[in-house]
Design a protein with these regions (language model features):
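Structured catalytic-domain cores with a bias toward divalent-metal coordination
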Residues: 1-449
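Low-acidity, Ser/Thr- and Arg-rich intrinsically disordered low-complexity segments
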Residues: 449, 453, 458-476, 483-513
Length: 513
């Protein structure tokens, strides 16, 4: 196995030359708070069907403000009508109702109530939401910009939304739906338990029941959509989420690759459904982590068999999909030190010498845009084509193990079409409207079994009895890092995984994005 120090020196080699070339070729950006000046730099992407805007962390104000400024420009000047974010659909739908003035809806403490609350309930998002509401007020209802959620984690909330909808439009169908979804009743509060129960033969899979429910809702599209097309779209999407979530929690024990791919496939399918519902010519903007919107084929993730929404968009739309990554060297970030732990404002360590962040940091430029698909920048793309490390901070940040927890190898000019650089960044500001996390009562379904009690701690205690399961999570980490918590990597597991890829450990340990 190669000496890590030799590999590190090889990646770091030539950084000064690359930084010098970037310094002369990149475009200096104003502060994103000056939206009218910042936004026009991104007019070059106005002809795309889909513009995907990334972030290197889930808690950096500069990234949120930059995405807001770019999004405003694309909406106002280039006809984009959909904003889709890495958030749960039911919460985003509440915001969508608010910004499109379509009945009960709000951006308040009821939105985005599950961990990590600060990711979408922060002042930067609130300001954008209020801008979008004001923008929509001035245009016809059928042309108003949508705000949608991409993610797969709203099992309980999506079940509740489907049942509420059917109670209103088809009470008999609601009774059937309750029986079908009753299969998932014991795990509504801790859905990760469901996968374990199926794995150990303690419960039959619920797949047939949730597939039947989705099929019935889709079969009644004409009947239901005549009453309210928007509400039907919402109910159908929630039924899709229940199916995807059932599959996700059932396969999460098989390893991180399969569950990651299912999640990002769901994100892509959601984007497709929203665009199709909007009609021909619809143009969308996606807000998600770099790890989702960059082309996974150009990263260690892809080299290990994973794909993401960015890669799927490139395959589907080609040059009509613009993947824009974001990076920073240092500053502060809103994050937790473990899953379901309180938010902290943490200091972001200066980047490693063998990372892309260090290359851009050596330019000495506070903010810049590097257009990697501009033919005039071919030299820059060639210089950046040597694989280097890239940092990814999710909702969990562990500075003490940053190399293993947050760095992965990538080829940046193949991963992104453009790269937005901030030398120093600051954490998001928790929204003044955010109260304590909502305590939701279990959904009443057709089942005699009580809901599973206990949180992540009891879940970990339950699985630690199985060395095989514990090893899977020790080695891959992703499933629990994403949904419940992160287990420490065992030394033996690290060694085994390192034989597969020198960066397998670093991409898996705390992948909370």
């Amino acid at each position: 196995m190669a000496d890590p120090k030799i590999a590190e020196r090889a990646r770091a080699e030539g950084a000064d030359q690359v930084a010098s070339a970037i310094r002369h070729a990149c475009e200096h950006l104003p502060a994103p708070e000056r939206a009218s000046e910042f936004g026009p730099f991104f007019d070059r992407f106005g002809d795309a069907r889909v513009v995907l805007l990334g972030e290197a962390t889930h808690g950096t104000a500069d990234f949120y403000n930059a995405r807001a400024a770019i999004t405003r420009r694309l909406i106002e000047d280039h006809g984009f009508s959909i904003v889709v974010v890495e958030a749960d659909w039911p919460d985003a739908n509440r915001v969508d109702r608010y910004v499109r003035h379509r009945g009960p809806g709000a951006y308040d403490e009821e939105c985005f109530a599950r961990f990590p609350t600060w990711m979408w309930r922060n002042e930067e998002v609130r300001e954008f939401v209020e801008w979008l509401r004001a923008h929509n007020e001035e245009i016809a209802p059928n042309k108003r910009v949508e705000f949608r959620g991409l993610d797969v984690y709203s099992l309980r909330g999506s079940i509740a939304e489907v049942l509420t909808y059917l109670d209103r439009v088809d009470p008999e169908a609601a009774k059937t739906a309750r029986k079908r979804y009753g299969c998932l009743s014991p795990w509504q509060s801790e859905p990760a338990w469901y996968g374990r129960a199926v794995l150990h033969g303690e419960h039959d899979p619920c797949e047939d029941a949730v597939v039947a429910q989705l099929s019935e809702i889709l079969a009644k599209r004409l009947q239901y959509s005549r009453k309210d097309g928007e509400d039907y779209l919402d109910a159908a999407q929630n039924a899709r989420i229940v199916l995807a979530a059932e599959q996700y929690y059932r396969i999460m024990y098989r390893g991180s690759t399969e569950s990651w791919n299912l999640r990002d496939r769901h994100m892509f399918n959601t984007l497709q459904h929203v665009m199709e519902a909007r009609g021909s010519g619809a143009k969308a903007i996606v807000w998600a982590h770099n790890s989702h919107i960059g082309n996974a084929a150009a990263t260690a993730m892809g080299w290990q068999g994973e794909f993401n929404i960015g890669e799927l968009c490139k395959t589907a739309y080609g040059d009509e999909a613009a993947l824009i990554g974001f990076g920073t060297d240092r500053g502060t970030v809103a994050a937790a030190d473990d899953w379901n732990e309180p938010m902290q404002v943490m200091r972001v360590l200066p980047s490693r010498a063998d990372s892309y962040e260090r290359v851009f940091g050596q330019t000495g430029i506070a903010r810049s845009l590097t257009d990697l698909r501009d033919p005039r920048q071919s030299e820059i793309s060639e210089l950046l084509a040597k694989p280097r490390l890239e940092r990814a901070i999710g909702v969990v940040y562990r500075p003490d193990t940053e190399f293993y927890s947050h760095y992965f190898e990538a080829v940046l000019p193949e991963q992104f079409d453009a790269y937005v650089w901030f030398e120093e960044t600051r954490a998001v500001t928790r929204s003044r409207r955010c109260g304590r996390m909502a305590c939701r009562r279990p959904i009443r379904l057709a089942s005699d079994r009580p809901p599973v009690r206990g949180g992540a701690t009891s879940f970990i205690a339950a699985i630690q009895g199985s060395s095989e399961t514990s090893f899977k999570y020790s080695a891959s980490g992703q499933a629990l890092a994403v949904r419940v918590c992160t287990l420490p990597i065992e030394p033996s597991a690290s060694a085994n995984l390192a034989r597969l890829s020198p960066f397998a450990v670093s991409t898996k340990e705390t992948r909370s994005f």
